[in-house]
Amino acid sequence: MNKEIIIGDWKMPECDTEASMNMWNARAQEFAKQRGVEDDDWVAALVKRHGMLPADGTFLDVGCGAGKYTVYFAKKCAEACGTDFSEEMIKSAEQRAREAGTDNAFFSCDNWHTLELAEKGWKGKFDFVLANMTPAIQSAETFEKLTEASCGWCLYIHPVLRTGSVADRLKKKIFGKKPDPRYPQLQYAFNLLWEKGLFPAVEYREHNWVRSFELERAVDIFKNDLKSKRTLTAEEEASIEKYLIEHAVNGIVEEEVRTTQFALYWEV
């Protein structure tokens, strides 16, 4: 698969940016509650094993969310920077850094899809660039920015398979078909790097979890997730709310998420 085909296939989907931002802002509280990263974490162990981040190096966390990896790796290097387009996520990340007493972690609210690395002063700046389970990477262009921002290593983590017990049913209900659980990003990303003459490596893991939302937040989150894909009618929005009300238990909506994730890493 050559670069022209990949660029044509892997391009930014049409989406409602405002709805997407609203969804991630609504989820900031959930992400803020995630416990900090430990040394035996899959990502942390992989980075250490391959010596991706020198002690005097710089780190960029693309789509940092509430900053758990930014704060963790700040303790391992000279300077860490997290970027995310959700203002609420950035606020949560800054709070996490303060609570951890980390004074070399910095955060920036940006849209990676439109960010100009040169204008930001980020071109070739970072010894290690991480994009972990983030919608910041949605096209060949947004993926290639990882390499452009790095002067050392990059690590890209994303599902190859993913199912969500609530989200999948809602997508089938609204869009008329069950979403394909398979993701093509690994094939695209690997081939883009190979075309550049780089030698990426890949590892996999199974990772499953249950997430819980109070009903009102669940309605907000799932509705904005679907609205980010296309405009919803009033009837469709009402149908989403009705489904969640019917499936809530004691005012709580639970979703089982099952994934097979890949970790693609390469040296620039």
Q: Can you name each region flagged by the protein language model?
A:
Residues F126-E141:
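A short SAM/SAH-binding and catalytic strip from SAM-dependent methyltransferases
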Residues A140-L155:
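A short glycine-rich, Lys/Arg-flanked "PGG" loop and its adjoining helix->strand segment in the class I
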Residues L60, K68-T114:
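Class I SAM-dependent methyltransferase SAM/SAH-binding core
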Residues A201-V268:
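Conserved Class I S-adenosyl-L-methionine
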Residues G65:
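Conserved glycine-rich SAM-binding loop
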Residues R182-G197:
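Short alpha-helix
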